[in-house]
């Protein structure tokens, strides 16, 4: 729809760190303490629309609406395996590409496998993604939003993150590291680094 495409032209708030929210508040001419409020809304609360940010002035909400959206991804579909041990999530990116995340329900933990690229440049014979070739790197927001939207959908804590979905994390290193830091931030999602892993294939650079 035209409304959906309009949203994709806006810059997502998810993916920004506290310094970037501070810069945004400066650009919009509002007090710096609003940056912490925005950060908390994005990563500690499950919000889908800017009108849900109740402690922010309406003037700021209006300014944000003109150039920003909350989520960079759209959840297209989610399916459960017959045993309910796995959930598969299909997302649409801001460029219109489709990516997947897989949730694994185990006895003492819930692990989400997150994609880091659309397609992959490596030709691993065991991997179906290799047949796509490399399309694009996911943004920090698109990496993080897989976690946030999956958590919202299943309505229970996700204890572990593995960057083992579509793509090679090492080839999108900067965005993956920034996403991991935001996942770990004690003022936000607060997921221990012990529970965040980045399996990688050998890469010649």
Specify the residue positions occupied by each region the protein language model found.
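Short linear Ser/Thr-Pro motifs
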Residues: 1-2, 81-82, 115-116
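Flexible, acidic/Gly-rich N-terminal and inter-domain linker regions that tether
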Residues: 5-110
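Short, small-residue-biased leader/transition segments that mark boundaries at the very start
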Residues: 1-8, 199-202
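Conserved Radical SAM active-site core
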Residues: 97-197, 201
């Amino acid at each position: 729809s035209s409304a959906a495409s309009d949203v994709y032209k806006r810059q997502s708030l998810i993916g920004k760190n506290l310094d970037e929210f501070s810069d945004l508040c400066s650009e919009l001419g509002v007090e710096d303490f609003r940056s912490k409020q925005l950060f908390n809304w994005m990563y500690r609360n499950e919000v889908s629309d800017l009108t849900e940010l109740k402690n922010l002035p309406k003037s700021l909400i209006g300014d944000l609406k003109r150039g920003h959206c909350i989520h960079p991804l759209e959840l297209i579909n989610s399916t459960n395996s017959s045993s309910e041990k796995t959930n598969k999530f299909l997302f649409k990116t801001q460029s219109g590409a489709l990516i997947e995340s897989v949730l694994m329900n185990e006895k003492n933990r819930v692990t989400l496998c997150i994609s880091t690229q659309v397609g992959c440049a490596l030709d691993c014979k065991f991997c179906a993604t290799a047949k796509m070739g490399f399309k694009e790197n996911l943004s920090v927001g698109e990496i993080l939003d897989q976690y946030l939207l999956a958590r919202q959908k299943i309505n229970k804590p996700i204890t572990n993150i593995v960057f083992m979905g579509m793509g090679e994390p090492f080839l999108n290193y900067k965005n993956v590291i920034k996403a991991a830091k935001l996942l770990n931030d004690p003022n936000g999602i607060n997921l221990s680094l012990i529970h965040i892993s980045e399996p990688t294939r050998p890469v010649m650079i």
